[in-house]
Design a protein with these regions (language model features):
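A structural boundary/capping signal
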Residues: 1-140
Length: 140
C-alpha cells in the first residue's frame, strides 16, 4: 500500500491547484473536477484508501480528496478568504469543512472525463483539463 508524505501530498496539491487555476475563469469552481481527477490519478498510481469528500463551504458545495492521512484541498486558493489555509492538512486535525458525503472514485480515464465534464463548457475543454492533470500529476 502506497502512502503519501506531507511533502508529496503538498506537491500534488500545488500541481493540481496550478492546473485548476488555469481553468477557473470559466465560471463555477473546479473543486469537483480537480478532486475527482486527482483521486483517480492517485488510485492509478497505487495510493490506497482515497476518497472524494464534499461538504458546504458556506458558499455552496466544496470538494476535496482524503487519504487515510491527509485532507488535500487543491482549490482553496480560488476563495480569497481561504488563501492562508494550507492545501494539505492531517485528516485528524479539525478545521476543514465537515464532509457531508463521500463519492466513488472514477475507475477509468473514461469515467474520470465523464465525472468532471459538467464543470466545463464542452468536451474539448474537459479533455484539455484531464490531459493537463495527467501531465502535471506524477508520483515519484
Amino acid at each position: 500500500m502506497r502512502k503519501l508524505s506531507l511533502q508529496e501530498a503538498t506537491r500534488l496539491a500545488e500541481q493540481t491547484a496550478g492546473v485548476a487555476e488555469g481553468h477557473i475563469p470559466y465560471g463555477s469552481g473546479l473543486g469537483a473536477p480537480a478532486s475527482f481527477t486527482l483521486a483517480w490519478l492517485l488510485q492509478e498510481a497505487g495510493v490506497e484508501e482515497i476518497r472524494v469528500a464534499s461538504g458546504s463551504s458556506g458558499m455552496g458545495d466544496h470538494f476535496w480528496v482524503e487519504t487515510d492521512q491527509w485532507r488535500i484541498d487543491p482549490t482553496l486558493r480560488q476563495f480569497a478568504h481561504l488563501n492562508s489555509r494550507p492545501l494539505v492538512e492531517p485528516v485528524s486535525e479539525p478545521g476543514g469543512f465537515p464532509a457531508d458525503k463521500y463519492h466513488a472514485i472514477p475507475r477509468s480515464r473514461q469515467e474520470a472525463v465523464r465525472e468532471v465534464s459538467y464543470g466545463f463548457r464542452n468536451a474539448a475543454e474537459t479533455e484539455q483539463f484531464v490531459r493537463e492533470m495527467e501531465a502535471a500529476i506524477r508520483l515519484q
